[in-house]
Amino acid sequence: MIRHSKTVLQKAHELEQKKNYTIRIGVSLMNPAAILLKQWKQASILYPDVRLEIVPFEDTVPAFLEVLDNLGSKIDLLSCPYDTKHWGDRYNSFHLMDLPLKVSCSKSHPLAEKDHLTLEDLYEQTLLLANRGLNPYTDPVWNELESMYPQIHLKGVDYVDIHLFNQLVTSQELLLSAECWDSVHPLLTTIPVDWSFTMPYGLIYSKNPSPELLQFLLAVGQVESV
Protein backbone atom coordinates (compact mmCIF):
# COMPACT_ATOMS: atom_id res chain seq x y z
CA MET A 1 0.00 0.00 0.00
CA ILE A 2 1.32 3.40 -0.98
CA ARG A 3 0.14 5.83 1.69
CA HIS A 4 2.67 8.62 1.73
CA SER A 5 3.52 11.30 -0.81
CA LYS A 6 7.27 10.63 -0.75
CA THR A 7 6.73 6.98 -1.61
CA VAL A 8 4.46 7.93 -4.48
CA LEU A 9 7.08 10.27 -5.91
CA GLN A 10 9.77 7.59 -5.65
CA LYS A 11 7.58 5.07 -7.45
CA ALA A 12 6.59 7.54 -10.15
CA HIS A 13 10.22 8.46 -10.83
CA GLU A 14 10.79 4.84 -11.82
CA LEU A 15 8.45 5.25 -14.80
CA GLU A 16 10.56 5.89 -17.87
CA GLN A 17 8.21 5.48 -20.83
CA LYS A 18 5.90 8.41 -21.56
CA LYS A 19 2.62 7.96 -23.41
CA ASN A 20 -0.68 9.73 -23.82
CA TYR A 21 -3.16 8.85 -21.10
CA THR A 22 -6.25 10.16 -19.34
CA ILE A 23 -6.77 10.74 -15.61
CA ARG A 24 -10.43 10.65 -14.55
CA ILE A 25 -11.21 13.10 -11.73
CA GLY A 26 -14.42 12.71 -9.77
CA VAL A 27 -16.21 15.99 -9.05
CA SER A 28 -19.35 17.10 -7.23
CA LEU A 29 -20.56 20.29 -5.57
CA MET A 30 -18.79 19.30 -2.36
CA ASN A 31 -15.70 18.05 -4.21
CA PRO A 32 -15.16 20.59 -7.02
CA ALA A 33 -11.44 19.93 -7.69
CA ALA A 34 -10.77 23.64 -8.31
CA ILE A 35 -7.61 23.62 -6.19
CA LEU A 36 -6.20 20.62 -8.05
CA LEU A 37 -6.99 22.17 -11.44
CA LYS A 38 -5.14 25.36 -10.51
CA GLN A 39 -2.12 23.30 -9.56
CA TRP A 40 -2.37 21.12 -12.66
CA LYS A 41 -2.46 24.19 -14.93
CA GLN A 42 1.19 24.76 -14.05
CA ALA A 43 2.22 21.10 -14.20
CA SER A 44 0.49 20.44 -17.54
CA ILE A 45 3.09 22.54 -19.37
CA LEU A 46 5.68 19.89 -18.56
CA TYR A 47 3.30 16.96 -19.09
CA PRO A 48 1.38 17.60 -22.35
CA ASP A 49 0.80 13.86 -22.75
CA VAL A 50 -1.70 13.82 -19.85
CA ARG A 51 -5.38 14.58 -20.43
CA LEU A 52 -7.89 15.18 -17.63
CA GLU A 53 -11.47 13.92 -17.78
CA ILE A 54 -14.05 15.28 -15.32
CA VAL A 55 -16.49 12.65 -14.05
CA PRO A 56 -19.46 14.00 -12.04
CA PHE A 57 -21.03 12.05 -9.21
CA GLU A 58 -23.93 12.59 -6.84
CA ASP A 59 -23.46 14.47 -3.55
CA THR A 60 -24.82 11.83 -1.19
CA VAL A 61 -23.04 9.76 1.44
CA PRO A 62 -23.84 6.41 -0.28
CA ALA A 63 -22.65 7.73 -3.66
CA PHE A 64 -19.45 9.09 -2.16
CA LEU A 65 -18.66 5.83 -0.37
CA GLU A 66 -19.35 3.91 -3.58
CA VAL A 67 -16.82 6.11 -5.40
CA LEU A 68 -14.25 5.42 -2.68
CA ASP A 69 -14.85 1.67 -2.88
CA ASN A 70 -14.40 1.70 -6.68
CA LEU A 71 -11.52 4.13 -7.20
CA GLY A 72 -9.61 3.12 -10.30
CA SER A 73 -12.73 1.82 -12.04
CA LYS A 74 -14.71 4.79 -13.44
CA ILE A 75 -12.93 7.44 -11.37
CA ASP A 76 -9.18 7.53 -10.71
CA LEU A 77 -9.04 10.11 -7.94
CA LEU A 78 -10.83 12.78 -5.93
CA SER A 79 -9.45 16.14 -4.83
CA CYS A 80 -10.82 16.89 -1.38
CA PRO A 81 -10.17 17.01 2.39
CA TYR A 82 -9.17 13.58 3.66
CA ASP A 83 -8.12 11.54 6.71
CA THR A 84 -11.54 11.05 8.23
CA LYS A 85 -12.67 8.00 10.19
CA HIS A 86 -16.08 8.33 8.53
CA TRP A 87 -14.66 6.99 5.25
CA GLY A 88 -12.68 4.13 6.71
CA ASP A 89 -9.59 2.58 5.12
CA ARG A 90 -10.81 2.74 1.55
CA TYR A 91 -8.10 4.70 -0.25
CA ASN A 92 -4.55 5.99 -0.51
CA SER A 93 -3.84 9.70 -0.04
CA PHE A 94 -1.45 12.22 -1.55
CA HIS A 95 -1.09 15.41 0.50
CA LEU A 96 -1.23 18.71 -1.40
CA MET A 97 -1.60 21.34 1.33
CA ASP A 98 -3.17 22.27 4.65
CA LEU A 99 -6.18 24.54 4.22
CA PRO A 100 -7.04 27.08 6.95
CA LEU A 101 -10.42 26.38 8.49
CA LYS A 102 -12.92 29.19 7.94
CA VAL A 103 -16.54 29.93 8.79
CA SER A 104 -19.43 29.89 6.31
CA CYS A 105 -22.74 31.64 6.87
CA SER A 106 -25.76 32.98 5.04
CA LYS A 107 -25.18 36.22 3.15
CA SER A 108 -27.97 37.68 5.27
CA HIS A 109 -26.13 36.88 8.51
CA PRO A 110 -24.91 39.93 10.51
CA LEU A 111 -21.30 38.67 10.20
CA ALA A 112 -21.44 38.17 6.43
CA GLU A 113 -20.04 41.61 5.56
CA LYS A 114 -16.84 41.12 7.56
CA ASP A 115 -13.55 40.45 5.73
CA HIS A 116 -12.31 38.31 8.61
CA LEU A 117 -13.59 37.18 11.99
CA THR A 118 -12.11 37.27 15.46
CA LEU A 119 -13.04 34.69 18.07
CA GLU A 120 -14.93 37.43 19.87
CA ASP A 121 -17.10 37.83 16.76
CA LEU A 122 -18.24 34.25 17.32
CA TYR A 123 -19.46 34.88 20.87
CA GLU A 124 -23.11 33.85 21.34
CA GLN A 125 -23.11 32.33 17.85
CA THR A 126 -23.80 28.65 17.12
CA LEU A 127 -20.99 26.97 15.16
CA LEU A 128 -21.75 23.72 13.34
CA LEU A 129 -18.87 21.27 12.97
CA ALA A 130 -18.27 17.54 12.63
CA ASN A 131 -18.98 15.50 15.74
CA ARG A 132 -16.07 14.57 17.96
CA GLY A 133 -14.13 11.56 16.77
CA LEU A 134 -15.09 11.79 13.09
CA ASN A 135 -11.82 13.38 11.96
CA PRO A 136 -8.59 14.61 13.53
CA TYR A 137 -8.82 18.22 12.38
CA THR A 138 -12.09 19.24 14.03
CA ASP A 139 -11.40 17.65 17.41
CA PRO A 140 -8.81 20.38 18.26
CA VAL A 141 -11.49 22.98 17.47
CA TRP A 142 -13.84 21.31 19.93
CA ASN A 143 -11.12 21.09 22.57
CA GLU A 144 -9.93 24.69 22.39
CA LEU A 145 -13.27 26.42 21.94
CA GLU A 146 -15.02 24.41 24.65
CA SER A 147 -12.27 25.00 27.19
CA MET A 148 -11.26 28.57 26.38
CA TYR A 149 -14.25 30.13 24.61
CA PRO A 150 -17.45 28.82 26.23
CA GLN A 151 -19.25 31.89 24.82
CA ILE A 152 -19.20 30.13 21.43
CA HIS A 153 -21.94 27.51 21.15
CA LEU A 154 -20.78 24.34 19.39
CA LYS A 155 -23.19 21.95 17.65
CA GLY A 156 -22.00 18.65 16.22
CA VAL A 157 -23.14 17.18 12.90
CA ASP A 158 -22.57 13.73 11.44
CA TYR A 159 -21.78 14.84 7.90
CA VAL A 160 -21.16 18.09 6.02
CA ASP A 161 -23.04 17.91 2.72
CA ILE A 162 -25.02 20.09 0.33
CA HIS A 163 -28.18 19.63 2.41
CA LEU A 164 -26.42 21.23 5.38
CA PHE A 165 -25.32 24.14 3.19
CA ASN A 166 -28.92 24.57 2.02
CA GLN A 167 -30.14 24.65 5.62
CA LEU A 168 -27.54 27.28 6.45
CA VAL A 169 -29.08 29.72 3.95
CA THR A 170 -32.17 30.26 6.12
CA SER A 171 -30.38 29.85 9.44
CA GLN A 172 -28.45 32.16 11.74
CA GLU A 173 -25.99 29.37 12.49
CA LEU A 174 -22.37 29.25 11.31
CA LEU A 175 -20.53 26.33 9.72
CA LEU A 176 -16.89 25.32 10.07
CA SER A 177 -15.68 25.34 6.47
CA ALA A 178 -12.64 25.86 4.21
CA GLU A 179 -11.48 27.35 0.90
CA CYS A 180 -12.40 24.23 -1.07
CA TRP A 181 -16.09 24.92 -0.31
CA ASP A 182 -16.02 28.67 -1.02
CA SER A 183 -18.23 28.34 -4.10
CA VAL A 184 -20.48 25.47 -3.06
CA HIS A 185 -23.54 27.68 -2.50
CA PRO A 186 -24.15 31.12 -4.07
CA LEU A 187 -26.18 32.32 -1.06
CA LEU A 188 -23.41 31.61 1.44
CA THR A 189 -20.16 33.41 2.17
CA THR A 190 -16.97 31.96 3.66
CA ILE A 191 -14.85 34.11 5.98
CA PRO A 192 -11.33 33.61 7.42
CA VAL A 193 -11.03 33.45 11.22
CA ASP A 194 -8.19 34.55 13.51
CA TRP A 195 -7.15 31.05 14.57
CA SER A 196 -4.58 28.49 13.44
CA PHE A 197 -6.82 25.49 12.73
CA THR A 198 -6.26 23.72 9.40
CA MET A 199 -7.33 20.56 7.62
CA PRO A 200 -5.39 18.31 5.23
CA TYR A 201 -6.32 18.60 1.57
CA GLY A 202 -5.12 16.39 -1.22
CA LEU A 203 -5.84 13.56 -3.61
CA ILE A 204 -7.37 10.22 -2.71
CA TYR A 205 -6.99 7.30 -5.07
CA SER A 206 -6.98 3.52 -5.39
CA LYS A 207 -4.85 1.28 -3.20
CA ASN A 208 -3.56 -0.24 -6.44
CA PRO A 209 -2.74 2.81 -8.59
CA SER A 210 -1.76 2.48 -12.23
CA PRO A 211 1.68 3.65 -13.41
CA GLU A 212 -0.07 6.49 -15.25
CA LEU A 213 -1.74 7.71 -12.08
CA LEU A 214 1.59 7.63 -10.24
CA GLN A 215 3.08 9.74 -13.03
CA PHE A 216 0.24 12.24 -12.62
CA LEU A 217 0.86 12.44 -8.86
CA LEU A 218 4.52 13.09 -9.57
CA ALA A 219 3.60 15.95 -11.89
CA VAL A 220 1.23 17.56 -9.38
CA GLY A 221 3.69 17.04 -6.54
CA GLN A 222 6.38 18.99 -8.37
CA VAL A 223 4.25 22.14 -8.36
CA GLU A 224 4.26 24.39 -5.31
CA SER A 225 0.90 24.75 -3.58
CA VAL A 226 -1.25 27.56 -4.98
Spans of model-derived segments:
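Alpha-to-beta junction loops
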Residues: 68-80, 101, 167-176
